[in-house]
Amino acid sequence: MVSKIDGKLFAEMIIQGAQNLSNHADLVDSLNVYPVPDGDTGTNMNLTMTSGREAVENNLSQQIGELGKTFSKGLLMGARGNSGVILSQLFRGFSKSLETYETINAKQFAESFKAGVDTAYKAIMKPVEGTILTVARDAADAAIQKAEETDDCIELMAYILEEAEVSLENTPNLLPVLKEVGVVDSGGKGLAIVYAGFLKALKGETISAQSPKLNKESLVNEEHDFHGVINTEDIVYGYCTEMMVRFGKNKKTFDEQNFREDMSQFGDSLLVINDEEIVKVHVHTEKPGDVFNYGQQYGELIKLKVENMREQHREVVKKEHDGGKAISTEETQAVDTAVIAISMGEGISEIFKSMGATHMISGGQTMNPSTEDIVKIIEQSQCKRAIILPNNKNILMASEQAAEIVEADTIVIPTKSIPQGIAALFNYDETDSLESNKSRMVESLEAVRSGSVTYAVRDTKIDGVEIKKDAFMGLIEDKIVTSHADQFETVKGLMAEMINEDSEIITMIVGMDADKTVTSDIEDWMEATYPDVELEQHDGQQPVYQYLFSVE
C-alpha cells in the first residue's frame, strides 16, 4: 500500500511513464487515422514527455509541489504537436494543484487529475470528444469517485488506468472517423501508456528501455537546424554555449536584468530562462570558460554544453560539397518585428524569405518544432513584436503556447499549410500594426485552397477512398480525395476536385522526391486541360510531399 506520494516517488512515476511511452511511441504512431508518412502523435507525445523527464532528472526534489513545477516547465517548453501541447496542459493543471504540498494522499492525487483536465479543456479552443481529452476526463472522474473508497494510491492508480482504457475503447463511438478506420484515439492511447508507467512506479517496478524504432534523425530540431548557411569566417562567436545553474544560498543574489546585461558582454544569441531555483543560459561566445566562471558566482553548475559552430559549419560545407544534406547554421538576426515561418524545404524557405519572413524554423509534417524552439527564435531575435506562421495544423498549438510565454507582443496567424502561409505573408505590411496585419492576413486564408500529393504508409479506407500502402494520395486540406498507384493520375484526380470555373491561379510547389518527367507531364496537361488558369511553379525541395498545390 502507498498512502503518500512525495517528490522522489513522483519523479519515479514520471520516469517510468516517459519510458513506457518511449517504448511504445511507434505503436501510438500506428494509430494515426490518416496514412500519411508523418511522425505525429506517438512521436510528439514521446518527445514532449522526454523533455519533462529530463527536466525532473536535472532538478530532483523531495517536495512533490516543487517537482511538479519542474515537470510542468519541462513539458511546456518541450511540447511538440497538438498532442504534446495537450499533454503539457494536462500536467500543467495537475502540477499546479500540487504546488503547496510536500506530499499528497490519495484524495489529493485524484484531485490533481481533475485539475489537469480542467486546465486542458480551458486551453483548447474547440475541444473534440473521442480524443485524449475524453480519456483524461473519464479517468479523472473515476479518480474522484474511487478516492472516496480507498486511501491506497496504488489501488487508485490501477482504477484510473482501468477507466482510461475503458474510455479509450469507446473513442470510436464518439469520433466517427476512428470507427471508419478501425482504430482507437492515438492520443488517448499515449496517455493510457503514461498512466501504466505511473502504476508500475507506484508498485516499485521499473520498465526497461527497448530499442528505439523511431527515425530520430528526421526529428532532431536543434537550434542550428533552423537557419540558412553562412560562411565559416562570418561566425563572430564560435562556441554555442549552454549552462544550467542551481542557485546557492551563500552565492551572489540573482537579478535577472543584471544577469542578462552581464551575459550579453560574452557574446550574442543570448537566451536566459529563470525558473526561481535554476537559470538556464544559451549564448554564442568566444570564451565558454568565462561564461561558466561567471555562472558559478550564482551557484552550482549542473549542466554544461559547448559546441564549436565553426567546426559544425565546416562539416556542413563539406557535406554540401559531397552532395549530402546541409544543416543550416545562420545566426538569428535582431529585428524590431520578427516574422517567423515554419518551413519544410530549402526552396520553400527561400520563398518565405523573399516575401518578408525574417526567421525560419525547420519543421513540418515529420518534424514538429517544440514550444521552446519557437521561443528561442523570438528571444534571440530581440524583437518587440513577432508574427508566427505555423503552416501546419499540428504546429499551431505549440505556436500559440510560445506566444503566451515570450515577452514580445506576439500573434499567431493560423496557417495550416504552406500555401496558406504564402498567402498570409503576401498580405503582410511591415509598416502596419500587428492588429491590422493579423486581420488582413487571417482574412486572406479564406481565399486559398490547399492540396498535396504524398504516399500511403499502410492500407486503409477513409473518407470513402480505398488506399493501398505505397500508393499516392491526393489531399485537399486534410481530406483524402483520391488515391492511385500512378503519381500523375493522382495529380489529375486532385486537380479535378480542386479547380472550378472561378479558379484563376494554380501554384505548384515541387518536392525533392518529385519525378522530373511527371512534373513536365503535369505542366503540359494543365496547359491543355485548364488553358484559362495560370500555372505558377516553384522548386520547394520539401520532403514527404511530392507536390503542394494552391488554387486561388
UniProtKB/Swiss-Prot annotation:
Pfam families according to UniProt: Dak2, FakA-like_C, FakA-like_M
Domain of life: Bacteria
UniProt xrefs under PANTHER family: DEGV DOMAIN-CONTAINING PROTEIN DR_1986-RELATED (PTHR33434), PHOSPHATASE PROTEIN (PTHR33434:SF4)
Name this protein carries in UniProt: Uncharacterized protein SSP1546
InterPro entries, alphabetized: DegV_domain_contain, DhaL_dom, DhaL_dom_sf, FakA-like_C, FakA-like_M, YloV-like
Organism: Staphylococcus saprophyticus subsp. saprophyticus (strain ATCC 15305 / DSM 20229 / NCIMB 8711 / NCTC 7292 / S-41)
Every DhaL domain range: 8-200
GO biological process: glycerol metabolic process
GO molecular function: glycerone kinase activity
Signal peptide: none
SUPFAM superfamilies according to UniProt: DhaL-like (SSF101473)
